[in-house]
Amino acid sequence: MIPALPRWRWALYLLPALLGVLPTLLSPGHIVGDGVDAYGTGWFFWWIKTCVTQFGDPSWTPLFFAPDGKNIFADTGNNFVDAVFSIPFQVLFGQSWSGPFTFFLLLGNTWSFERLAAELWSDVRDVIVATAAWMVNPYVVFELTAGRPTQAVMWWFPLAVLMLHRICRGDRTVRTAAALGAATALTAWTYWFAGYFLAFLLIPLGAWWSRPGERLGALRSITIGALVCFVLVAPMAVGMAIAWKHGLVPGVNGGGPEAANVDADLHGVWLMETRGAPLLIQPAWLVAALTGAVVGKREGRVWFGIALVLTAIGLGARLGGGRIMNPVWSVVGDLPFLARLWFPYRITMVVMLPWTMLAVLAWQRFGRRTFVAGLFLALSLTGEAFSGTFPFNHKDAACPPLVLNAAKEPGMFLVLPGGIQSDVLLWQTQFQRPMFAGMGESAPAFWPSGYANRRHNSWIKALQESSASPNRPHVAPTGDKSALTQLGIRWVLLRRDLIIGIWRNERSRGGKDVLKGRDAKAIAQLNVLLGEPAAADQRLILWDVLGKYTDPAFPVTGEKLATPPLDEEDRPGFERGMIRMHRMPE
């Protein structure tokens, strides 16, 4: 019987959610999260709203890698469930939609998990403590602060576990079986690999929960659920199989993690835990889980065993920098598209379920004392705050007026230096002009063939080298700058602030003096190639290849060109936390 839950529990749930998004709510125009994935998320959410409201095709966009465009379906599998749910928030709150939507996301996570917890435990205190812990578990907090709400949406998978539990306890109705399939399919539609992660969790749970003598009946219901799931994911699966057959799927039809600019040593659980944000080994959670495994008797041992198996999958296909094959992957590695799982640490999303169960078992052993539960939650949030993940990082998504003014006239943008994923993706949601490169330009696996060829154009190479390596000798481009207009490029935008990131390694070796003069050299070389700039502020310089545009609001002056931006990078808060914990170099 599901226990009656007091209404005051929502105050306990809502408080950490509100604390997490409060800095974003107090910063109009900001999005939750920071870093490269946050930029892409902000763009995708805007794109889905645009497609829904204007009846466009979300599977392809002409705004990146113009004129080729970008095949979004082949690159992402159209994981847009969370983006669709964000549309009302974008309409209601405009550029400040992200904070309210993230609050809603956390409430959805809480509601679905509480349904499961209320079925597994009869004591109201267990349900409330487990749900409060789930709200702030390190995986969800880290994914949100890094700008990945898609991976933090866990609305459906607790419901799938709930339906499986009911089936294994004797509920053989078609409705429950269909609900199991639908919840699993929705998990996959939200983030495709989460469908695999959930299946890896459901298999041992089904074997454990099903009663001897009733397993055949449970298997029949589970089979019905699997069929429902297959029907619901079939549109994507068939489309992706066709794209795979035609060699259109990056990472499956060629190009591994390195081709996607992913360090092979940083995408599995172990090195994520030791070099990135601590998730499973965050001290409060690790102590609670290990305690639960010891004092929880058989139940604790089973939950801990399930967590270990799932974590073994999350180590990735190869260990030790690629030298050792993970034996677990000899079992799961041949599943369709799993070769594209460049971030297997994300299986932590389902490992957090047994981790939460173990924490509750430990709490029960301590007599369900309120002080112990409060201490655990406080230490969990303190650990996340120390690592720089809580409250959630946030980023100003506003497009600079200099760019908005230029974009009132037609033309493609070439952003320099190239090969860097930056917040210009967020700006594009407002200036809405095509770009020469765009999302994925730092990852060769995602380049259209036409873009890969155009990068070798002598003018493109000259502009890139002038902005990124002004101290090195360059080969002069052939012909005049009309070669750029033939590519469709009108606007060349120099991000002076991004140049600092390119020179970070040399700065760390030789100090700030090594940067002296480089900014001026880059501008001088670009002026030789493009002529005088059309507009400038301290961090941006804009050239009009056609030579027809000037912006009186941002006049080009010698003082502006001679004053470089502050030579400090705007690094995400969680990266600063990793530096503080000596997990990431400065």
Where are these regions (language model features)?
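Membrane-helix boundary/interfacial segments in multi-pass membrane proteins
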Residues: 143-151, 255-260, 309-354, 451-458
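Periplasmic/ER-lumenal interhelical loops and adjacent helix-loop junctions
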Residues: 35-51, 226-294, 333-336, 340, ...
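Membrane-embedded helix bundles of polyisoprenyl
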Residues: 13-19, 101-120, 125-210, 225-229, ...
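Membrane-interface junctions at the ends of membrane-embedded or membrane-associated helices
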Residues: 1-6, 118-120, 165-178, 207-221, ...
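Hydrophobic, aromatic-rich transmembrane alpha-helices
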Residues: 2-3, 207, 211, 228-231, ...
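Hydrophobic alpha-helical membrane-interfacial segments at the cytosolic entry of transmembrane helices
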Residues: 9-17, 182-183, 215-238, 256, ...
